[in-house]
Amino acid sequence: MIDRYGRPLEDLRVTLTHVCNFSCFFCHMEGEDTESMQGLSPHQIGLVSRVAVEFGVKSVKLTGGEPTLRRDLPEIIREIRTSGVRDISMTTNGFLLANIAGKLKDAGLDRINISLHALTREKFKDVTGVDGMDRVIAGIREAKNQGFKPIKLNFVLTKRNSEEAKRVIEFSEEIGIDELHLIELHPVGLGRSTFSFHQGMEELEKEIAKIAVKSEIREKHFRPRYTLPSGLVVEIVKPYANPIFCAGCNRVRLTVDGKLKTCLYRDDKVIDVMYALSNKDLTLEERLELIRHGFEAAISIREPNFKYMMKIEAQQA
């Protein structure tokens, strides 16, 4: 289904929990209110996924908090898989991944994004609050052993870890990572208080572009992508105040408390479907129909957060 700005709905991001075993200083917690910590049940997530497929959703990404803290994570993945979703991925800090990667693969998880914000032990602990670099690296290696494809690493660039970027690039090349996402720090949710650590990407991107054997713009989100001689693809993620990024947005978020959040940056553009998910007096079809109404409403209010910048640029052209 397409919104009034011509953007199709293709992705659903599901926040499984707000609990995390890391305390990264820049975490935006998916732009959600953190008062509600426990997420929806596997069955509830499955219901929303089932309706989402009817509206054109092809892929689901599991986020947090830290998704691997959910003991029922394999069950959640199976519920989503049976709903008809084509592609299931997850973003994780990787700390627990080495022990459960096989179970997640067997349950139907296709792809993994693993956060790696430093490759020196002291800096890793400074960024995440946890002395867990070795366990994260073990998780990355086990994900490769299990055959997840592609495996992507996420690196959030800040003033506190900018010197780590090249180390992470080299590590990604050495072990055969498919893609590395260099992500701009942006002021969303809890991340607003740490935006003073924002580090521009211009110089780093120029250095990467110089050695790249191929450069392109990702069609889905209009992000620059550079293929290095090693085969590693480096993608630049700069969503903040970026109307081009907003123009390519094709996702809706399902929050831990049962709301459809239409924009990471907006707290007012949400539709509550918790009644449909939690009312035991409703039949299955009644629940599904209410969730359908929720998606229809969400799509009707969905709009690019930075559309005002589109208007300014159009006037200046």
From Swiss-Prot:
Enzyme class: lyase
InterPro entries in the record: Aldolase_TIM, Elp3/MiaA/NifB-like_rSAM, MoaA_arc, MoaA_NifB_PqqE_Fe-S-bd_CS, MoaA_twitch, MoCo_biosynth_MoaA/MoaC, rSAM
Catalytic reactions on record: GTP + AH2 + S-adenosyl-L-methionine = (8S)-3',8-cyclo-7,8-dihydroguanosine 5'-triphosphate + 5'-deoxyadenosine + L-methionine + A + H(+)
Annotated GO MF terms: 4 iron, 4 sulfur cluster binding; cyclic pyranopterin monophosphate synthase activity; GTP 3',8'-cyclase activity; GTP binding; metal ion binding; S-adenosyl-L-methionine binding
Pfam families, A to Z: Mob_synth_C (PF06463), Radical_SAM (PF04055)
Coiled-coil ranges per UniProt: none
EC number: 4.1.99.22
Domain named Radical SAM core: residues: 4-223
Amino-acid positions noted as binding [4Fe-4S] cluster 2 in the UniProt annotation, renumbered to this chain: 246, 249, 263
Superkingdom of origin: Archaea
Co-factor binding details: Binds 2 [4Fe-4S] clusters. Binds 1 [4Fe-4S] cluster coordinated with 3 cysteines and an exchangeable S-adenosyl-L-methionine and 1 [4Fe-4S] cluster coordinated with 3 cysteines and the GTP-derived substrate.
Binding site for [4Fe-4S] cluster 1: 20, 24, 27
Keyword 4Fe-4S found: yes
Keyword terms of this UniProt record: 4Fe-4S, GTP-binding, Iron, Iron-sulfur, Lyase, Metal-binding, Molybdenum cofactor biosynthesis, Nucleotide-binding, S-adenosyl-L-methionine
Biological-process GO terms, alphabetical: Mo-molybdopterin cofactor biosynthetic process
Binding site for S-adenosyl-L-methionine: 65, 115
Pathway: Cofactor biosynthesis; molybdopterin biosynthesis
Annotated binding of GTP, by residue: 13, 61, 91, 152, 251-253
UniProt keyword annotation of 4Fe-4S present: yes
Entry cofactors: [4Fe-4S] cluster
Biological function: Catalyzes the cyclization of GTP to (8S)-3',8-cyclo-7,8-dihydroguanosine 5'-triphosphate.
NCBIfam families for this protein: moaA_archaeal (TIGR02668), PRK00164.2-1 (NF001199)
Family (UniProt): Belongs to the radical SAM superfamily. MoaA family.
Protein name per its UniProtKB record: Probable GTP 3',8-cyclase
Organism of this sequence: Metallosphaera sedula (strain ATCC 51363 / DSM 5348 / JCM 9185 / NBRC 15509 / TH2)
Lineage: Archaea, Thermoproteota, Thermoprotei, Sulfolobales, Sulfolobaceae
Gene: moaA
